[in-house]
Amino acid sequence: LHSKHGSVPRAVPGITVGHEMVGIVAEVGSAVSNVKPGDRVTVNVETFCGECFFCKKGFVNNCTDQNGGWALGCRIDGGQAEYVRVPFADQGLNKIPDGVTDRQALLVGDVLATGFWAARISEITPEDTVLILGAGPTGICTLLCVMLHSPKRIIVCEKDASRLQFIRRHYPQVLTVQPEDCAAFVRAHSDHGGADVVLEVAGADSTFRLAWECARPNAVVTVVALYD
């Protein structure tokens, strides 16, 4: 949808979309050694060469190869088709263990990996109050990955009542709040005048502003969402 709305400048009109997928390897090129035909695999949303300056720094989304970064479903044909060619397959494909279903593995290629990376770079400590703005699929995956860091307190802000109910039912230890009450709620439930870490996963102008309103001085604010 971001591509359709014109919010992805590098998107190529007319390509086959689809960047979240699992599949079975049909063929491999001569340089591929990590997977073989018949392997069940996830496909990373980011393809990357592993050799350029940004790849070596870990910023694979900025891979300088023409088929690197967000290429699948954006600049080259993606996964909403019977077959898809995945560049840099040794880095871009991951074997799925036998005990993991396709449905479960599908999350690994994008939304869960996005949440994992966002939580990792947010420098979360056990003393922190962490605010997550947005409880859609990526927001919930971000919540799961934030929980791995065991912060003192997690607050989820979401306007949709059904999503808030989902959080309360499955994660009763997590505090929840609606956007109109968020800033005051965070101040009342934090130790230093605001959240120590804010992860913005909603992608709206209003939530981008709210992230900074809820952050304490010298907080970490991680922008996870894309914006139209």
Where are the language model's segments positioned?
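Short, intrinsically disordered, charge-balanced linker/junction segments flanking boundaries
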Residues: 1-3, 34, 223-228
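NAD(P)H dinucleotide-binding glycine-rich loop of Rossmann-like/cofactor-binding domains
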Residues: 51-133
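Mid-domain Rossmann-like dinucleotide-binding core that forms the NAD(H)/NADP(H) cofactor-binding site
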Residues: 95-184
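Glycine-rich cofactor phosphate-binding loops and adjacent beta1-alpha1 units
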Residues: 122, 126, 147, 164-228
